[in-house]
Structure formats: structure tokens, C-alpha cells
Amino acid sequence: HESSFMGVFGSDEEAAHVLSAIKEIGLDNSHSRFEKGENGCARVKIDEGDRIFLGSNSGGVTREYPIQLTEEDREYLNQFELIHMGLYSHVNHLLEELQNVSGKISYDFSDDFTEEEVQRAIDKVDFGFFSIEDFSDEEVKQFLMKHFCERNDVLIATRGEKTAIGYDGAKFYEVNPVLEEPVDTMAAGDSFLTAFLLYFLEGDDIVTAMKMGNEFAGKSCLVDGSFGFGIHYD
């Protein structure tokens, strides 16, 4: 599968490290922006395999210099079957404009969304992902039903070690996670949604795609930093 990244890079060591990882992977970032300042960065600690956020710079240059699409960007985006963004991408201002692209739109609402943020985006995306660990099964189902709208294909709530629940407007789908002794749970949710979307868009049913998402998330929890490329810093 071919993929690319369109974002805003800073001018610090963190930016240089991310760019070197992207280059080594072979990920296209030809439509990214480069600005002077801090790259988006979060500080975390790992406690018995669980990642705990200590703070961040709120997106750094991604927040300070939000992307405005050019005509070349729009033509480029139309090459893709799927465009993924999230609550921390600082691109909500593009949601209306992206209604004109040919591909599906996926959105990660993460775990600290507000009702206002959900309402602002939910009717403009095909796939919505939520991290909701403290809700009961019934509360999750009520939440997904409440927010599902005509535009949506599938909404999914992942819940750590609990059952992931999906909803397509007619039926709920529940899949148990693949439980491994984690090395680092960083980006487990991102891994889930990536695999889910790939399999679902290739024609697999929702349950099969969710199972593949759980399997890939389990594997990513066995890798430091979710995909490696770690460096030491002070």
C-alpha cells in the first residue's frame, strides 16, 4: 500500500529525527510544509508497558502554521482512496474543503475529545474512531448511536484491554483485543485503525477488519515507540 504524509515540520532536532525516519521508511512527504520553530512533540514515560503522557508543545509549528491547501495539494489528495486526520492534526479548518476530494475521510477523535469537537467533525467523515476506556459496553453503544450520522460508514470505539465496539448505523460489532504483555502501548489505537481501514477498504467485512486491527495493535505494543526509530535525549 502506498501512503504519504502531509504535515508541518519544524526546524529542531525532533523534526530532523522524524524526517530521517520518514526517509528510511520511504514515506512520501512532498506536500509537507517546513517552518522555523518546534516540531510537534509529546513527552511520555513507559510504566510497565503502558505509555503515560507527561505533556506536549500542543503541536508546535503544526498549530502555529496551519496548512492551507493549494490547487496542487487538492490534485495530489485526489489520488488517494483515503485521507486520515485527527484531533491533534490541527486541520479541522480543512474538513469542509475536503468534502470535495474523491477519497474517504477518516478521523481519530482520540480520548479527550469534547462534544463540541465531535459535532464539528462527525458529519464530514466516513470513519470515526474514539478511545473510550471508562465507558461500559452499553454506554459505548449509546454513544456511538447518538453520534452516528448519514455520512458515516462505521464508527468504532477502542477501549484498551476491553472489547472494541463498532457501529454501522444498523448493527453493533464487538471484537476482543489481542492481549500481549506490552513493551510500549504507544500508538496502539493508530495501529488498530490503520489495519482496520486497509482491510475494510479492500472489501473485508467489519468484524474481520476489526480483528485485523486488533492483531496489528497487539503487534505494535511489542515494539518500542510503536515502530522503532528511538533515540536518546536529555
Feature-to-residue mapping (PLM):
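Glycosyltransferases and closely related glycan-assembly transferases
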Residues: 78-79, 92-105
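Flexible, active-site-proximal loop/turn residues at the rims of small-molecule/cofactor binding pockets
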Residues: 38, 89, 134, 161, ...
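Conserved phosphate-binding/catalytic region of the ribokinase-like
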Residues: 141-234
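Short catalytic-loop micro-motif centered on adjacent basic/acidic residues
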Residues: 4-7, 82-85, 105-108, 129-130
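Active-site glycine-rich loop that binds ribose-phosphate moieties when present
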Residues: 62-72, 86, 108-117, 138
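Short, well-ordered alpha-helical microsegments
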Residues: 15, 91-95, 114-118
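Conserved phosphate/ATP/ADP-binding segment of small-molecule kinases
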Residues: 99-105, 109-174
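Conserved N-terminal subdomain of the carbohydrate kinase-like
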Residues: 2-81, 234
